[in-house]
Amino acid sequence: MGLETVPAGKALPDDIYVVIEIPANSDPIKYEVDKESGALFVDRFMATAMFYPANYGYVNNTLSLDGDPVDVLVPTPYPLQPGSVIRCRPVGVLKMTDEAGSDAKVVAVPHSKLTKEYDHIKDVNDLPALLKAQIQHFFESYKALEAGKWVKVDGWEGVDAARQEILDSFERAKK
């Protein structure tokens, strides 16, 4: 059994499973799980000397407008191992556009059964302002030194937009 068998969640869109590809604060290497084999591949070495400000992964059985599963950032008290799966609750979404088109990054917090530390966070605006700024800065800058690549941050949207992003992507994947 591989990661491809992990369901999207227990109760979409509020209770999701996120497959972690990149731990928080890790070296500037972009990893991606190959959806067919379940193997973790090095996608590229990032040209900028930056690290992901939160764990980064995706929701299985979803298809975003960019052609990939829904991207999710998960702040946790400790970095998570690549290939691990964490039960989460979405709280918001960072809407962006890059050289390939529309690109959204859902932000989700660990489910209450894993830790009570994030229970007070109901919406992206409940996250620490510094963490939101770090996430936004990271995505505004992480492709800056890569030829032909760019990112424009369109802004933050709340929990309802994150839920809709997950539901729309789940439905898109079923087609």
From Swiss-Prot:
Q: What's the chief localization of this chain?
A: cytoplasm
Annotated Pfam families:
Pyrophosphatase
Q: Which residues bind Mg(2+) 2?
A: 71
EC nos:
3.6.1.1
Binding sites annotated in the UniProt record for substrate: 30, 44, 56, 142
- Catalytic activity, reaction form: diphosphate + H2O = 2 phosphate + H(+)
User: What cellular-component terms does GO give this entry?
Assistant: cytoplasm
Residues binding Mg(2+) 1 are 66, 71, 103
Transmembrane residue ranges: none
Query: What does the record give as cofactor?
Result: Mg(2+)
What GO terms are given for molecular function? inorganic diphosphate phosphatase activity; magnesium ion binding
* Location(s) in or outside the cell: Cytoplasm
Q: Keywords assigned by UniProt?
A: Cytoplasm, Hydrolase, Magnesium, Metal-binding
- Subunit structure and binding partners: Homohexamer.
Protein name, entry field:
Inorganic pyrophosphatase
